[in-house]
Swiss-Prot record:
HAMAP family: RNApol_bact_RpoC1 (MF_01323). It comes from Lotus japonicus. One of its GO terms (biological process) is DNA-templated transcription. It is an enzyme of class 2 (transferase). This is DNA-directed RNA polymerase subunit beta'.
């Protein structure tokens, strides 16, 4: 069992048979060692009690009811009297029943079994370490081939080398005539190895440091060969693939050395049995039992393993082919338990439903890790859909009233009592239920000094969870500034976010100093800005500044305008005859827009200050309009200049839209605010 106070992380990897035995084995007070599951039974059909040495045995996994053994005797847990701590009749310890959530058992396999994750998953770790094709290793594991066992400093009678098919050997029927049955088995086992045992022998003989050195030497030789012979493209690709394989092989060997994992641990001799509470049998209405699929897969393994034990021990005259066939069945049963369907057709029950194996239980969105460990429900948390909050600051978020009053209810009750708005907790809760006006005022004060954390799954990097200062908003959706969406990889098409309230002072300080959104503007991976306009903001800016498609030359022949005007609406034809209005300042233009005298994208002329005008002296006017008083207008593509008789500039008008004005004013206010903040800092 993992101590939650001592261990804050979890590492998954291969373990030795000794470690599996240490997890599952326990010594009873009378000195008896228990832990091995030898029977494929669960509960007795008459007594409804767990079978001894079965998958739910109370001697191995602990009592079903705290302090009560199989016989029905009772002892107080934690009692310091000299009474025995276990039942001498049934051998069950008087301990808490919660032990059945973490106490494991084991199955002692009659033959070594290859772990299918390391053999069949890509890349195959066993094939990479042994530098052999995966098909050859599969044929060896599933007894399609046999392997000649090298006998050091001893002559071999059959003179076999490498892999061979046992079925087609000429000596298969002739040599047994000269041996007794037991003698031939000893002779055959001396020179022939098959199944996962052959894989294990090769992994035991493997020296990882020699693997690294030999792979490095071959990698260098291939590099020199590729530099000298670079004419054949096919050979270059072949050499490149081999070099990539050697790099993966060296990295894998270094990983095994660094983590102190032995390669032979990828072949199982002991099979762990999960605690019973993780694979329960539940009785439903009508007396029917519902069992976890893992129990049926365990039973299949135990049945086949016990059959193999009988063939190896009780029957001395068992043919070798029958033993190899039974070893293959044990291997397939363990494969189904670990990963059902990895070798093709999955195993199904009587209702044609596929059994759920270990892989199905732990992987995916509904697996043990993502649903139970990473996605478990916690207190002081909520969840809702996100919507855009265009008026929010970067470090703020809008929290719905309904969610806020639940998350901050504890703090709200304390503030109501402290400020004498409520005499006790009951009165405070009644005020909160009635949603009196004073409640919202106190809630705003509480939230003002308390940050919250927003998280969007999957949390693939540290910007997947950020801190914000909450403010109350109407509705039921979380309002979010659009600039922070890239860090969350979120958009406003129905995405949901989780809300967490940091409780301790340390958590609140960490949220304020390290996790606020306005302090996380750069990507932690590459250092590029991550708070940049995306999606909704880009579309909004485009619509804001797009304007009318017709330019100032709309009344003249222009090829681009002629192409764009094919699908113009009737209102655009009316626009050609309508004169564009003039405004002396932006306030008048915005007032006309609010009075619906002009449209959002309708162009107009806006008087501009001379000190803010930048004109190109080489640009020629498109048209020149002369007035009766001698003044004239130089009309350019985007601005208009009114000059006097002496050619002096009287005033300047720019051709713009309401969207451009709004965008310019926002940028101007932002720059002025930045300059003021910078001057205050100096």
């Amino acid at each position: 069992m993992i101590d939650q106070y001592k261990h804050q992380q979890l590492r998954i990897g291969s373990v030795s048979p000794q470690q599996i035995s240490a997890w599952a084995t326990k010594i009873l007070p009378n000195g008896e060692i228990v832990g091995e599951v030898t029977k494929p039974y669960t509960f007795h059909y008459k007594t409804n009690k767990p079978e001894k040495d079965g998958l739910f045995c109370e001697r191995i996994f602990g009592p079903i009811k705290s302090g009560i053994c199989t016989c029905g005797n009772y002892r107080v847990i934690g009692d310091k009297k000299d009474e025995p701590k276990f039942c001498e009749q049934c051998g069950v310890e008087f301990v808490d029943s919660r032990i059945r959530r973490y106490q494991m058992g084991y199955i002692k396999l009659a033959c070594p079994v290859t772990h299918v994750w390391y053999l069949k998953r890509l890349p195959s770790y066993i094939a990479n370490l042994l530098d052999k094709p995966l098909k050859e290793l599969e044929g060896l594991v599933y007894c399609d081939f046999s392997f000649a066992r090298p006998v050091v400093k001893k002559p071999t009678f059959l003179r076999l080398r490498g892999l061979f098919e046992y079925e087609i050997q000429s000596w298969k029927y002739s040599i047994p005539l000269f041996f007794a049955t037991h003698g031939f088995d000893t002779f055959r086992n001396r020179e022939i190895s098959s199944g996962a045992g052959a894989i294990r022998e090769q992994l035991v003989d493997l020296d990882l440091r020699i693997v690294i050195d030999s792979s490095l030497v071959e990698w260098k030789e291939l590099g020199e060969e590729r530099s000298t012979h670079n004419e054949n493209e096919w050979e270059d690709r072949k050499v490149g693939r081999r070099k990539n394989f050697l790099v993966r092989r060296m990295e894998l060997a270094k990983h095994f050395i660094r983590t102190n994992i032995e390669p032979e641990w990828m072949v199982l001799c002991l099979l762990p049995v999960l605690p019973p509470e993780l694979r329960p049998i539940i009785q439903i209405d009508g007396g029917k039992l519902m069992s976890s699929d893992i129990n049926e897969l365990y039973r299949r393994v135990i049945y086949r393993n016990n059959t193999l034990i009988d063939l190896l021990t009780t029957s001395r005259s068992t043919p070798g082919e029958l033993v190899m066939c039974q070893e293959k069945l044990v291997q397939e049963a363990v494969d189904t338990l670990l990963d059902n369907g990895i070798r093709g057709q999955p195993m199904k029950d009587g209702h044609n439903k596929v059994y759920k194996s270990f892989s199905d239980i732990i992987e995916g969105k509904e697996g043990r890790f993502r649903e139970t460990l990473l996605g478990k429900r916690v207190d002081y948390s909520g969840r809702s859909v996100i919507v855009v909050g265009p008026s929010l600051s970067l470090h703020r978020c809008g929290l719905p009233r309904e969610i806020a009053i639940e998350l901050f209810q504890t703090f709200l009750i304390r503030s109501l009592i402290r400020k004498h708005f409520a005499s006790n907790i009951g009165v405070a809760k009644s005020k909160i239920r009635e949603k009196e006006p004073i409640v919202w005022e106190i809630l705003q004060e509480v939230m003002r000094g308390h940050p919250i954390l927003l998280n969007r799954a999957p949390t693939l990097h540290r910007l997947g969870i950020q801190a914000f200062q909450p403010i109350l908003v109407e509705g039921r959706a979380i309002c979010l500034h659009p600039l922070v969406c890239k860090g969350f990889n979120a958009d406003f098409d129905g995405d949901q976010m989780a809300i967490h309230v940091p409780l301790s002072l340390e958590a609140q300080a960490e949220a304020r100093l390290l996790m606020f959104s306005h302090t996380n503007l750069l990507s932690p991976a590459i250092g590029d800005p991550i708070a940049v306009p995306t999606q909704d903001m880009l579309i909004g800016l485009y619509i804001l500044t797009s304007g009318n498609r017709r330019g100032i030359c709309a009344n003249r022949y222009n090829r681009s305008n002629w192409k764009n005007s094919k699908n113009e609406k009737i209102r655009d034809k009316k626009y050609m005859k309508k004169k564009e209005p003039f405004f002396s300042n932006s306030y008048d233009a915005i007032g006309a827009f609010r009075q619906k005298k002009i449209n959002f994208d309708s162009p107009f002329w806006l008087r501009w200050r001379l000190d803010k005008c930048i004109m190109s002296s080489r640009e020629a006017p498109i048209e020149v309009h002369y007035e009766s008083l001698g003044t004239y207008h130089d009309i350019y593509e985007h601005y208009l200049v009114i000059r006097s008789i002496k050619k002096q500039i009287c005033c300047i008008y720019i051709r713009t839209t309401i969207g451009h004005i709004s965008f310019y004013r926002e940028i101007e206010e932002a720059i002025q605010g930045f300059c003021r903040g910078y001057s205050y800092g100096i």
